[in-house]
């Protein structure tokens, strides 16, 4: 499920929500509720409290680009910025158990989604090697993570059946997004360990990323998709070249 600069798509989506099992460090505990069943935790409820919404890309994108001006009676009025800078609240990280299962040796494996952005660059490089991505300088990988608006991860955490065994934690998936923190976000570097593909984890990761961006009031969501994964993103609600809008690229020619 790697994302590459091949074909562009823009999202007008409202992702399905998840029923989640909060971890101890999450701080989003479901008080008094029994643990969720050991399966991929999709919520198939009808969502009565939240009406489905779609965003018009033409209105949303272009309105955001011209949002510094108001037109009234054929005159243009400049919108004055606030007198004091508005401090942006730091979004609280989210950590959820998406899947829990017992392995053949009796150990327990949990697949944990996190938006805390805690990624070891060496673990990420190893994951990129597994999916066949070309290696990039570690300093640039670290900079890309540091400068991202959102970094979401999937970790496999295995707890042995015997108390004396050590817990094992492995990075198995990641996606990140850059943003102007107001209107637009672009999703990059979506990847899942090949040994964990085909289990719905890539879809779960993307839906959580989209939902997190929507919760932060980011409604114009774009990405670049390799031809092999265009259908995957279309099934999530992304649209290629909406209303004739084309992605354009500039490359150095030296």
UniProtKB/Swiss-Prot annotation:
It is found in: Plastid, Chloroplast; Nucleus. Residues 1-83 form a transit peptide. PROSITE patterns: GNAT. Pathway: Aromatic compound metabolism; melatonin biosynthesis; melatonin from serotonin: step 1/2. The keyword Plastid applies. It catalyses: a 2-arylethylamine + acetyl-CoA = an N-acetyl-2-arylethylamine + CoA + H(+). GO terms for biological process: circadian rhythm; defense response to fungus; melatonin biosynthetic process; mucilage biosynthetic process involved in seed coat development; negative regulation of seed germination; photosynthetic state transition; protein quality control for misfolded or incompletely synthesized proteins; regulation of anthocyanin metabolic process. SUPFAM superfamilies: Acyl-CoA N-acyltransferases (Nat). Residues 119-254 form the N-acetyltransferase domain. Its EC number is 2.3.1.87, 2.3.1.-. GO terms for molecular function: aralkylamine N-acetyltransferase activity; L-lysine N-acetyltransferase activity, acting on acetyl phosphate as donor. This is Serotonin N-acetyltransferase 1, chloroplastic. Its main location: plastid. Catalyzes the N-acetylation of serotonin into N-acetylserotonin, the penultimate step in the synthesis of melatonin. Catalyzes in vitro the N-acetylation of tryptamine to produce N-acetyltryptamine, 5-methoxytryptamine to produce melatonin and tyramine to produce N-acetyltyramine. Acetyltransferase required for geminivirus infection and systemic spread. It comes from Oryza sativa subsp. indica (Rice). Keywords: Acyltransferase, Chloroplast, Melatonin biosynthesis, Nucleus, Plastid, Transferase, Transit peptide. One of its GO terms (cellular component) is chloroplast.
């Amino acid at each position: 499920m790697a994302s590459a600069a091949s074909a562009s798509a823009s999202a007008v989506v409202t992702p399905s929500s998840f029923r989640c099992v909060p971890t101890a460090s999450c701080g989003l505990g479901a008080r008094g509720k029994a643990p969720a069943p050991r399966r991929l935790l999709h919520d198939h409820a009808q969502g009565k409290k939240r009406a489905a919404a779609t965003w018009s890309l033409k209105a949303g994108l272009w309105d955001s680009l011209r949002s510094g001006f108001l037109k009234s009676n054929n005159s243009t009025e400049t919108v004055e910025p606030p007198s004091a800078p508005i401090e942006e609240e730091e979004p609280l990280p989210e950590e959820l158990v998406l899947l829990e299962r017992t392995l053949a040796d009796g150990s327990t494996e949990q697949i944990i989604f996190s938006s805390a952005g805690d990624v070891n660059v060496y673990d990420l490089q190893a994951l990129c090697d597994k999916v066949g991505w070309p290696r990039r300088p570690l300093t640039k990988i670290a900079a890309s993570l540091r400068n991202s608006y959102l970094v979401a991860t999937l970790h496999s955490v295995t707890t042995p059946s015997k108390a004396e065994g050590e817990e094992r934690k492995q990075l198995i998936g990641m996606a990140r997004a850059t943003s102007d923190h107001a209107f637009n976000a672009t999703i990059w570097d979506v990847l899942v360990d090949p040994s964990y593909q085909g289990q719905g984890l890539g879809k779960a990761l993307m839906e959580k990323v989209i939902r997190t961006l929507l919760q932060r009031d980011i409604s114009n969501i774009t990405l670049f998709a390799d031809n092999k994964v265009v259908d995957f993103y279309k099934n999530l609600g992304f649209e290629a070249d909406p209303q004739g809008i084309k992605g354009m690229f500039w490359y150095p020619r030296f």
